[in-house]
Amino acid sequence: VEITELPINIPPRTSPEVYFTESNSGIAVLLQDRDASWLGIAHGLKSIGVPFRIVESIELALEHDVILVYPTITGSNTAPETLSALANHVRGGKSLIAFSVIGGGLPLLLGFESTEERRDLLELNFDSGIFDGNFFQDPAETSIRLSALENPAPMPGVSYHTLKNPPIATYDNGSAAITQNSYTVGDRTGYAYAVGFDFGHFILRVQNDRFAGLADTYVNDYQPKIDTLLRFLAKVHRDGSPDAVQFLTTPFNQEFTALITHDIDFTRSIENVPTYAALEASQDIPATYFLQTKYVTDYNDSLFFTQDSQATLQSLHDQGMEIASHSVAHSNEFKNMELGTGTETYPSYQPFVFNFETVRKASIAGELRVSKFLLDSLTAQTTVSFRPGHLSLPYELPEMLLATGYKYSSSMTANSTLTHLPFRMNYSRNYDTELDIFEIPITIEDERGRLGDRIDESIALANKIANHGGVVNVLIHTDVLDHKLEFERRFIAEFKERAWFGTVAQFGHWWAVRDSAVVKVETVNTQTKRVLITTDGAIDGLSIRVPKDWTYEEGLEGSQQQDDVLVLGPFEDIAQVLFSLPASN
């Protein structure tokens, strides 16, 4: 068994150059300060599917139709020629979204006259009627809490005053948080926005679980707060660029992604696995089984991971199910365990749970590497997904997952992370260094009220998430059948034709390849656009939203257009498609 090299040395900060490409399609993020929380902006734009590159020169930024300036604009941090170029950019019919604008000669351009720096921000509220169409479809999408209800710690920011147009969003005291202005030049309209609240810092703080108390509920509810911020940025991109292309968030342009996941962490749970798997196999639904490799009898339960488990695991594998790790000890103290040595092996690794608060002879490395070794040894698979018992979350989990060979985590709830989309994780859940680990948060679980009594509210929740193409990750323990099995049967029947169902690993792989995608839009002639997409690996069902008057012509076998969405056929590394435009273009 290989020794795990523990990630005890802090890696270097992720460089903005990681997000620089030669493509000038999408948004230019003009970075003013490398020490800012720009990684939150980058991860957010990746999640929502908006193409972008990070630049540090105004010359490169001006190659784009839409420029996002982050984290601040002041008279002292922005050169006069840059300020002038940004103003001319907007007055020429292109778009600008600027964060924390304090002076610099741009207030009137952005639609306000004065600013106020604040440290008392408690809430951000979007005007639900400010955008046409169905941008806001639920009250939960319009209000974002910026401070916990208990022990509030208000956030800093900027408010804008004496506005030219109604604000897009306001703070709890009624002052403007996001302003808007526009300039029409010929057939082009340039839009200018000032944002007084740091999206990047908020995203990183919440998704790294360092901002507790913001959500109304822990799980089983609709909390799309980060998603609203990201959809706003996507709208700015779409409105500001005539060639806007966006990567959609679900495979094959389905309404949402549905993941059926099971936690097997109780003696009787493994006995019920074949019944759940039979239901899923009969519906051609692959599910993920997070299995505790419990080979020690302790306070929690008797051991149940034995040689007899192999037949069950092999049957799951043969039916197309994913087998994932749910740790060895299933201890709530996982979050407080030592890293370990990286040499932990079965059977000498013997973690013992004394009670809910106490576990001995356990380590994070042991929980990860020993459970993975056992699952890999008993099946013909490589275990790549992990979920901790009790969703106990060590700060070091992301880098320890990477060190022990995992790729995907399902360790947090969608409500606690304020998003119904996957996201990339950072080293030690901090703000500076990204890792190749993706979190797919849990949406619905079965411990807070009888699951069988919650099918209607769960369907309603899934429909809300479907409005914007999110992920519904359902956690069902297999400790009983009856109402839980019936819940799953009804959930699958309700959404089988509308959602894309897959395993955590299947969706995680699709999402990771999508995350690597870079798009370049080229003008072939007055009536033809070429879209070139490159990825790190093979992908099927990647979907792109294009301008409504584009018609797919040719380029990739198996591609199908559905209104303004092109579902791309399977490809590896590179795809090229051509669109025709109306003669008037």
Segments (PLM) and residue ranges:
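Aromatic-Pro/Gly-enriched surface loop or interdomain linker
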Residues: 2-66, 222, 228, 280-281, ...
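Extracellular ligand-binding/catalytic regions of CAZymes and related secreted enzymes
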Residues: 3-22, 43, 187-191, 196-256, ...
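A glycine-rich, often tryptophan-bearing local segment used as a flexible ligand/cofactor-contacting loop or short
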Residues: 76-145
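Catalytic grooves of carbohydrate-active enzymes
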Residues: 262-264, 437-507
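Surface beta-strand/loop "capping" patches
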Residues: 507-548
